[in-house]
């Protein structure tokens, strides 16, 4: 009897050990998915803008840290306020070899266009950073301060030109917040990217632009442009001489997020590979020095679940501003 009990116990223990080994093997195999061909990195804006800089900086950091076994190919699909490129990713269901830069403006664009794919039609992988919104002028502009802009706008309502990336996105939403706070009216001029905005202000085609640091840092370092105000609670450490709107009596703040998405329908193993890759990238010196510090962004890691929730929370805020702009009926 005793021998039989011992035998039963050994048999049961053997089954448990085999089950653990089998489960570990299956889990290991699931976690071992890796891309096998070049990854298309869709940027839904023209070259030279903030999203383009984001994608190329990510690729450089990932390459520096050897986090991906295959190369990336940047595919710029500007137009439609970011909707053309976003639609490309949304329609590539189950494509394991495609990523998409995903920012606040793509949420807004989807709200303003009926039937357009929303963030719910994508797999959001990670939120990586918060970018700042500033008003930037050409170095020799007569607008030395934001007070100069306000004074001129009151004298010439609806005629002061201010450029920004696309219609109904972060730049135009910030512009509306400024108009509302200061009781002003500008003539907003949309462009396909931050790079085009810089070209326009340098060429005198618009009097000022809304821009992120990643879009104007090279020209600022070359003393070609000047930021005059930032839509932030406190001054930027990197630009201590640039005041906030709030300091000047206008309650204008805006947090522009930058992140990464993928097509819908990818497997949990594929999503886990990319999320882990991005997390390791976000911890690297190559990323923190080569992108965040260089272009003056704030690090804000959010994993897939948290980033998706964060985007959902911002959606009704954007909807309210777009309704004011008459872009949502």
Predicted feature locations:
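An extracytoplasmic/periplasmic, membrane-proximal ligand-sensing/linker region
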Residues: 36, 180, 184, 266-329
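N-terminal (or domain-start) structured segment
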Residues: 30-121, 159, 183-208, 219, ...
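Bacterial N-terminal signal peptides
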Residues: 12-25
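Ligand-binding pocket segment of bilobal, Venus flytrap-like solute-binding proteins
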Residues: 78, 159, 163-167, 171-242
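Residue-level signal for nonpolar/aromatic packing positions in well-ordered secondary structure
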Residues: 39, 48, 55, 74, ...
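Hinge/capping helix and adjacent helix->loop/strand transition within the periplasmic-binding protein
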Residues: 64, 88-98, 110-196, 245-247, ...
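Short secondary-structure boundary segments
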Residues: 103-104, 139, 213-214, 232-233, ...
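N-terminal secretory signal peptides that target proteins for export/translocation
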Residues: 1-12
């Amino acid at each position: 009897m005793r021998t039989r009990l011992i035998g039963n116990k050994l048999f049961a223990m053997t089954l448990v050990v085999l089950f653990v080994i089998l489960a570990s093997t299956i889990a290991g195999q699931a976690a071992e998915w890796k891309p096998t061909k070049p990854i298309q990195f869709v940027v839904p804006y023209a070259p030279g803008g903030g999203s383009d800089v984001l994608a190329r900086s990510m690729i450089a950091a990932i390459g520096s840290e050897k986090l991906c076994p295959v190369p990336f190919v940047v595919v710029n699909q500007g137009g439609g306020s970011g909707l053309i490129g976003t639609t490309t990713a949304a329609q590539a269901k189950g494509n394991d070899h495609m990523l998409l830069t995903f920012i606040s403006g793509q949420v807004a664009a989807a709200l303003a266009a009926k039937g357009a794919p929303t963030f719910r039609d994508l797999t959001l992988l990670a939120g990586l950073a918060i970018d700042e919104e500033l008003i930037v002028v050409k170095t020799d502009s007569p607008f030395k301060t934001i007070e100069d802009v306000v004074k001129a706008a009151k004298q010439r309502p609806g005629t002061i030109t201010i450029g920004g990336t696309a219609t109904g996105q972060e730049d135009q939403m910030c512009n509306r917040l400024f108009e509302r706070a200061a009781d002003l009216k500008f003539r907003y001029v949309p462009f396909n990217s931050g790079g085009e905005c810089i070209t326009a202000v340098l060429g005198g085609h618009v009097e000022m632009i809304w821009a992120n640091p990643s879009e104007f840092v090279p020209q600022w370092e070359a003393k070609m442009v000047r930021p005059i105000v930032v839509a932030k609670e406190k001054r930027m450490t990197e630009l201590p001489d640039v005041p906030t709107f709030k300091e000047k009596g206008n309650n204008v703040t805006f947090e522009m997020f930058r992140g990464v998405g993928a097509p819908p329908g990818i497997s949990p193993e594929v999503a886990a590979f990319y999320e882990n890759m991005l997390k390791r990238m976000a911890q690297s010196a190559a990323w923190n020095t080569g992108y965040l510090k260089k272009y003056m962004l704030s690090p804000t890691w959010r994993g897939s679940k948290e980033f998706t929730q964060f985007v959902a929370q911002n959606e009704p805020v954007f909807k309210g501003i777009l309704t004011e702009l008459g872009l949502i009926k």
